[in-house]
Amino acid sequence: MKVTQEKLPASQISLEIEISPEMSKNAYEQIIKKYIRSANIPGFRKGKVPRNILIQRLGKNYIKAMALDDLINNCLEKAREQESIKAIGQFELKTEFEELVKDFEPGKEMAFSAKVDVEPEAKVEDYKGFLVQAEEAKYDSALVDEFLEERRSRMGTLIPIEGRAAEMGDVAIVDFVGIIPSETEGEEAQEVPGGKAQDFQMDLKEGQFIPGFIEGIVGMKLQETKEISAQFPSEYSEANLAGKPVVFTVTLKELKEKELPELDDDLAQEISEFETIDKLREFLEQKFTKEKEEKTKQNKEKAIIDELVTHLEVEIPETLIKNEVQQMLAQSAMDLSQYGIDVKEFFSSEKLPEMQERTRPEAIERLKRDLVIATVAKRESITVDEEEIKAESQKVVKQLKEKDFDSDRLRQVVTQELLKEKTIKWLEANGTVELVPEGTLHTESQTPQTTEILETEVESEIPQASETIVEVKAEEVATVENSQE
């Protein structure tokens, strides 16, 4: 067997494989023997079927196809080992299989060509002596005050409102459905996926939903139904909705205002396991300080990698891109399902191709960032030893508790993260990162989902007591008012 390699664009190689007459004959004879042993043909015992009867019954082309399939697969595997090819994904024939079957004659020479994606050869120049800027995230005591006020608001008593229109700061209970108007005449309007709810409770605060939605509810009266026109931001998290106009039909069913508790030890005990408000503040100060330090670390890491990516030379194979897109969409589906959203609506067979195409640029960018780290680590002989991987994996397993996980995937992720951490540390020592005030540099904004209220991450890590929003009925309010007269 003779193998000739040829480099192709996009990190592919082509193999021209020449097969000897002996190999082609042996492949054909092996298939004949296999079917003689296993074929069930009336009038003959297994293993006793005459050769000519078998060929007549199965058809010579069928037997040739089976023989050629085995022959090609075996030859490709031998070629991969013989030529030390670091293949990614599956080999793809450059000639139609049917054509190869047609030309295949057992006992005669033959040749075929196949191509395959291989590990990309990445080059990074000028990765030492760089100068980049990164935002320094500093702790501000206002973060604690804002968080406590938000929790205080949640623990407020809801008092029904009658006799006035909705105002900012109220709590509204509404039914709504969002419709994307048709762009062409005769086309039906499209209902917004996940943009429909009944008896949905919301705080009338700016920034909770897409611009225009909350503002449209302000001024509505009880039991009023109104159409509110809005537009999804151009950088909306769901790309298929970004920039599109939307009309919400909203019915205001109930309106309430909050009577807030005092910010004292009693409140601290209600919203956490801390006995005093001072202890809770101390915990929050430490937590937010740590978060800001971690954010600064992430900003520095991003700035370094962004700079190095500009010096990266690489052709990324299609197989890697498709795999990355698949992983990203799978993660998105998992995240959406945690909010109770039916992912089948988002990832239908009609929408999936478009979502894959929209995800592709980000997937390529992520791959470039990974390749930059891997390339520098290889150039500078930065490695992770087995003990480090084992220790970090055990930490992650403890955090996962009893959740199911893929141990091989876990090891891969842990190894990549440790290698990245070591490489970033090395790069910091061999370059300069200038810290600038937070908000100085451009950062990507995050737009909330239609029915999604994003909570502060620190909230889930505070030792919790009970969480209760006391709701007072209208008749109870009347009783209280009468007793005060």
UniProtKB/Swiss-Prot annotation:
Major subcellular site: cytoplasm
Entries under InterPro entries matching the protein: PPIase_dom_sf, PPIase_FKBP_dom, Trig_fac, Trigger_fac_C, Trigger_fac_C_sf, Trigger_fac_ribosome-bd_bac, Trigger_fac_ribosome-bd_sf, Trigger_fact/SurA_dom_sf
Ranges where the PPIase FKBP-type domain occurs: 169-261
Protein's cellular compartments: Cytoplasm
Keyword Amino-acid biosynthesis recorded: no
UniProtKB keywords: Cell cycle, Cell division, Chaperone, Cytoplasm, Isomerase, Rotamase
GO molecular function: peptidyl-prolyl cis-trans isomerase activity; protein folding chaperone; ribosome binding
Gene3D superfamilies according to UniProt: 3.10.50.40, Trigger factor ribosome-binding domain, Trigger factor, C-terminal domain
PROSITE patterns: FKBP_PPIASE
EC identifiers of the protein: 5.2.1.8
One of the protein's GO biological processes: cell division
Function: Involved in protein export. Acts as a chaperone by maintaining the newly synthesized protein in an open conformation. Functions as a peptidyl-prolyl cis-trans isomerase.
NCBIfam families xrefs: tig (TIGR00115)
Family: Belongs to the FKBP-type PPIase family. Tig subfamily.
Protein name (Swiss-Prot/TrEMBL): Trigger factor
Lineage per the UniProt record: Bacteria, Bacillati, Cyanobacteriota, Cyanophyceae, Oscillatoriophycideae
Name of the coding gene: tig
